[in-house]
Amino acid sequence: ETLMDTRTATAELGWTANPPSGWEEVSGYDENLNTIRTYQVCNVFEPNQNNWLLTTFINRRGAHRIYTEMRFTVRDCSSLPNVPGSCKETFNLYYYETDSVIATKKSAFWTEAPYLKVDTIAADESFSQVDFGGRLMKGXXXXXXXXXXXXXXXXXXXXXXXXXXXXXXXXXFFKKCPSVVQNFAIFPETMTGAESTSLVTARGTCIPNAEEVDVPIKLYCNGDGEWMVPIGRCTCKAGYEPENNVACRACPAGTFKASQGAGLCARCPPNSRSSAEASPLCACRNGYFRADLDPPTAACTSVPSGPRNVISIVNETSIILEWNPPRETGGRDDVTYNIVCKKCRADRRACSRCDDNVEFVPRQLGLTETRVFISSLWAHTPYTFEIQAVNGVSNKSPFPPQHVSVNITTNQAAPSTVPIMHQVSATMRSITLSWPQPEQPNGIILDYELRYYEKLSRICTPDVSGTVGSRPAADHNEYNSSVARSQTNTARLEGLRPGMVYVVQVRARTVAGYGKYSGKMCFQTLTDDDYKSELREQLPLIAGSAAAGVVFIVSLVAISIVCSRKRAYSKEVVYSDKLQHYSTGRGSPGMKIYIDPFTYEDPNEAVREFAKEIDVSFVKIEEVIGAGEFGEVYKGRLKLPGKREIYVAIKTLKAGYSEKQRRDFLSEASIMGQFDHPNIIRLEGVVTKSRPVMIITEFMENGALDSFLRQNDGQFTVIQLVGMLRGIAAGMKYLAEMNYVHRDLAARNILVNSNLVCKVSDFGLSRYLQDDTSDPTYTSSLGGKIPVRWTAPEAIAYRKFTSASDVWSYGIVMWEVMSFGERPYWDMSNQDVINAIEQDYRLPPPMDCPAALHQLMLDCWQKDRNTRPRLAEIVNTLDKMIRNPASLKTVATITAVPSQPLLDRSIPDFTAFTSVEDWLSAVKMSQYRDNFLSAGFTSLQLVAQMTSEDLLRIGVTLAGHQKKILNSIQSMRVQMSQSPTSMA
């Protein structure tokens, strides 16, 4: 950059000459005939010449190195005549650094001392007189460089000693590297260094919309004002592309650039868009998504449609599901499948997630195949399976995965394995064993089969001592096994040899057959020495017991005499009522006898003795499922330490209760806690140390038997219904053996679990303690509440409740089961029911009821309670029916029992009906009213012509309902043919 150039001057230069007669400023012309200002001197003929010429003040403007360029002419000394020997053809160039003006016309210093010599200037060519005469300046050019340190300016001085010279032009300038954009970084103009070899570092900054890649960003400026050695660089950031390598331009709408770099903007991938400039990413359109691992350059994809064409193959309690892939994969190739399993109630109105026991092969989630095998399901249970199709973007969608559902109901299956056996006692010749019910009975357990044999070696396994062992090695005696059967979960193996080890296995049987045998367990009979030792240990106890027995008998005789005398004067009904709860019948030897909690002076003591206290923190209440006498009933979960979580039913005592109500509420737990039978509802425990007070029992998925049967009218076979009745009878037999009288046996008080196992429940006494006139089921009688339709006549008339009166109630339950939950005695009043029974009328057989079952009902309804069958006999009779299903094929009719008058409700009087609605109501099929009317069957004449195909067409699909309606239509036709004009 030029600091001074005399060629551009249009006025006097104003330099300082010394002496004044030395250098003279004159005008001249350059080679191009341009006017220029020059200085000349030629005092060669005068001695001692020392002519100085000093430039004006030159501002260096930060330059570290200043260059001077001079154009001049020098006279050839030889062309001058008589020139003295001091004539020279050179002159000297000096410079001086200063911060201010150092010379004027009046003052200056003219010695070499303060100046720094740049060079002695000599011309390449000197000129003669002729050349110089035309004032056309031709001459030589000389360039010199001077380094400037810290001063702000410099002055140049030319000293001519006895020379004839003219300074045609003088220029001072410096070099710099210009501002430049390189590698998308801008570098400022930079002065060269003080030395010609200097490299000056210049820091760069990224241009707008560019970002550093390598740091630091710098260039080097060399002494010639040239950039060199680039280090570091910038590139255009995401959303911008390079333009001519000097700028970063925003990506237009509809394009994007995902990352920093030299790449160009690209069009948005399919199913995406960018509505603004400089987009680093194209947003997916509605309904389309990117997976977390999808690059921005990938197309947006959607979720798959649901699987298609599901095929289900049910095999007892397992199922195979197969399906076709979805029609739409969403544009992806990572489709997998999830299986959602839901276990439902019989009416499918409520479903819940399957428990963790259900097994899926190969897996439940993330299936890549279109097939899954599902096992360990419950028998006779409706299930809904959802097959979800998912892909890499399904988790991005706000909607649940597309799926296809399939409803299935599992079949009857054999029971699961009995988990373990325990030895109750042993003698020299026998072993008494017990075992829990299989975890999955898959129906009603009919009986158990035990297989046992004598082990040749007395050693079972090294880690087993005493009575219980695990699987022993194979034994040749195994092929000579003996078999025993038991109708309960206890058995006594007799006829054994003393001191021998026996290997025992057990399996359960339902109507579906036998389950698998349990693992082999080892048990040992007593040796003669063992028996004698045990006898010696028990002898003092036996003697003491005998003595106590004598005292007890004497006391009992004395008490009996006193009580018999008092009985003549006492008519206390309540006491005798309580007494019958535990003093009826005779218990078997060694059988535990029921103890009435109301005989305790402190009823809370009975609760503590018979019911386990549960910490409320182990209980989780989920939803209300009903209401009881004392409060609401909930479904919940119970997780006891060391045990798996189970569903439970939770009865609560409402707030504001009295102490009497609390005692009455907990009395049911005191009763239930004494029972342990697979057909009796199981008490888990009570919560009495916090509020609300709770009774916790096992949860029965299908609820009360009467409503369950009504919901599944016609859906069960006769053998299944008999299996249910057998379970109820087994539970009642157990209660009778405990000397407990239920008093309120009815289908509404039988609960059904998911395996169709029926369990007797409702042991509360609230109905005797509260007079709720809103419930017509119970009628006041002698100060108590009695369910008339289910109660034996002697109990209604005299409050004589015994196990025999429970047998009468059991006969009514049989009728309820075989009629699929119909109300006993239909819409007759309680008084009409009492009158009919007194006149020896009995209920007729339900539709399609086997004659053998109806006969058993009639046996239960014998007026003389002593002639009714015992509950043990009923269990045996039902077992025979189950073993011989052919005995159930004969269907009972009203005319088949001429000796017993029956209430006749099987053929209603159709002449009394005025509409189809009345007729449907009479046959308990009102739910099909709209089906009949919308299909055009608006009169009884049209209904009488209907066929089974017509019923299917209008939506009557249940086989039991079809049969009931067709039987009624057949009877209607008979009455119409007998009285053709009697019906409108």
UniProtKB/Swiss-Prot annotation:
The name this protein goes by in its record: Ephrin type-B receptor 1
Main localization of the protein described in the UniProt heading: membrane
Family of the protein in this entry: Belongs to the protein kinase superfamily. Tyr protein kinase family. Ephrin receptor subfamily.
Residues of the Fibronectin type-III domain: 303-413, 414-528
UniProt PTM: Phosphorylated. Autophosphorylation is stimulated by ligands.
Classification via SUPFAM superfamilies: Fibronectin type III, Galactose-binding domain-like, Growth factor receptor domain, Protein kinase-like (PK-like), SAM/Pointed domain
SAM domain ranges (all copies): 911-975
Keywords attached to this entry: ATP-binding, Cell adhesion, Cell membrane, Cell projection, Endosome, Glycoprotein, Kinase, Membrane, Neurogenesis, Nucleotide-binding, Phosphoprotein, Receptor, Repeat, Transferase, Transmembrane, Transmembrane helix, Tyrosine-protein kinase
Function field: Receptor tyrosine kinase which binds promiscuously transmembrane ephrin-B family ligands residing on adjacent cells, leading to contact-dependent bidirectional signaling into neighboring cells. The signaling pathway downstream of the receptor is referred to as forward signaling while the signaling pathway downstream of the ephrin ligand is referred to as reverse signaling. May play a role in axon guidance during nervous system development. May also play an important redundant role with other ephrin-B receptors in development and maturation of dendritic spines and synapse formation.
Record field: transmembrane: 542-562
Organism name: Gallus gallus
GO biological process: axon guidance; cell chemotaxis; cell surface receptor protein tyrosine kinase signaling pathway; cell-substrate adhesion; dendritic spine development; dendritic spine morphogenesis; ephrin receptor signaling pathway; establishment of cell polarity
Positions in the Cytoplasmic compartment: 563-984
EC number: 2.7.10.1
Domain Eph LBD: 1-182
UniProt entry tagged with the keyword Ligase: no
Catalytic activity of the protein: L-tyrosyl-[protein] + ATP = O-phospho-L-tyrosyl-[protein] + ADP + H(+)
Source superkingdom: Eukaryota
Lipid bilayer topology: Single-pass type I membrane protein
Extracellular-side segments: 1-541
